[in-house]
Amino acid sequence: MKLAVIPGDGIGPEVIAEALKVLDVVVPGVEKTEYDLGAKRYHATGEILPDSVLPELREHDAILLGAIGDPSVPSGVLERGLLLRTRFELDHHVNLRPSRLFTGVRSPLAGAPDIDFVVVREGTEGPYTGTGGAIRVRTPHEVATEVSTNTRFGIERVVRYAFAKAQARRKHLTLVHKTNVLTFAGSLWQRTVDEVGAEFPEVTVAYQHIDAATIHMVTDPGRFDVIVTDNLFGDIITDLAAAVSGGIGLAASGNIDASGTNPSMFEPVHGSAPDIAGQSKADPTAAILSVSLLLNHLGDTEAAARIDAAVAKDLAARSGTASTVEIGDRIAAAV
């Protein structure tokens, strides 16, 4: 395996070091190439993602990212220049976000909710394509538009990915949208789900409006298995999914080119947390679970299962506080 590693900013290098420690135990001999992309490079050279780096990234089987963002750089500069550009250049049309409440982890929900579902979010369309504009700016008559772009091609490939996930899990898929108001895009999403769903007769299909889905994710999260949704609704609902299952500190994600043409990128959901960087206070669990997602994506399900089991064992036994390295050592020993 050839792995591109982008430690990034803040706590990124610390959590990635522990994730790689675990990876080296379950899959020895991975060929790694580290890229110094992030705030330091931006300040030193003015570069965020040089054109010369993209062809190099494409030569790898996968990309592992730590965290991006630094208070010394204006908000959004690094995120747009690195994360969004990578997503579009490498056609990461699937954003995969598992949500699982591990034993030993407290949920803000009452009782012991059954939480084990995944959200499949479309990643390259919707209102995030930069289509729109503004006129009469800074006048009383200013008008701004933000256009949501939805294509049959873009929707179908994400829907197919979601159905395949559902087929391999508990065979239940929920489309989340707002078809009663967003009638044009909603109709296209619903028809695509209906047509692709006919090819997966074992998968039960349901629909929920986005507002209803947020309610049920809090009151009855066990009803969900695989959720498929668009870019904007997915952006919102995935953070809620992380919150009910213990917080973004435990949330892993995959930005995936389901065609396999380009390497997919895996990362913890949490930010760079510059206030605790360098203090070994960061929890590397989300980065380690991102390695599990990476291995699952590449077909090494056995190694991924070993990581998941080791993480579950560690979380169930945790008490008090532990350093970043201590947590990484414990999970590496448990795999």
Curated annotation (Swiss-Prot):
Q: Where is this site: Important for catalysis?
A: 128, 178
Top enzyme class, one word, equals: oxidoreductase
Tell me the pathway: Amino-acid biosynthesis; L-leucine biosynthesis; L-leucine from 3-methyl-2-oxobutanoate: step 3/4
For whether the record's keyword set contains ATP-binding, the answer is: no
Write down how the cofactor binds this protein.
Binds 1 Mg(2+) or Mn(2+) ion per subunit.
Compartments where found: Cytoplasm
Q: Which residues bind Mg(2+)?
A: 211, 235, 239
| Catalytic activity from the UniProt record | (2R,3S)-3-isopropylmalate + NAD(+) = 4-methyl-2-oxopentanoate + CO2 + NADH
Query: Where does this protein hold substrate?
Result: 87, 97, 121, 211
Q: Which cofactor does it need?
A: Mg(2+); Mn(2+)
Listed A to Z, the keywords are: Amino-acid biosynthesis, Branched-chain amino acid biosynthesis, Cytoplasm, Leucine biosynthesis, Magnesium, Manganese, Metal-binding, NAD, Oxidoreductase
Q: Name one GO biological process term.
A: L-leucine biosynthetic process
InterPro entries the record matches:
ICDH/IPMDH, IsoCit/isopropylmalate_DH_CS, IsoPropMal-DH-like_dom, LeuB_actb
What GO molecular function terms would the record report? 3-isopropylmalate dehydrogenase activity; magnesium ion binding; NAD binding
Q: Which GO terms describe its cellular component?
A: cytoplasm
Question: What EC number(s) are associated with this protein in UniProt?
Answer: 1.1.1.85
Pfam families, A to Z: Iso_dh
Question: Quaternary structure?
Answer: Homodimer.
In the record, the note on similarity to other proteins reads: Belongs to the isocitrate and isopropylmalate dehydrogenases family. LeuB type 2 subfamily.
Q: What does this gene product do? A: Catalyzes the oxidation of 3-carboxy-2-hydroxy-4-methylpentanoate (3-isopropylmalate) to 3-carboxy-4-methyl-2-oxopentanoate. The product decarboxylates to 4-methyl-2 oxopentanoate.
Which protein is depicted? 3-isopropylmalate dehydrogenase
**What is the native source organism of this protein?**
Nocardia farcinica (strain IFM 10152)
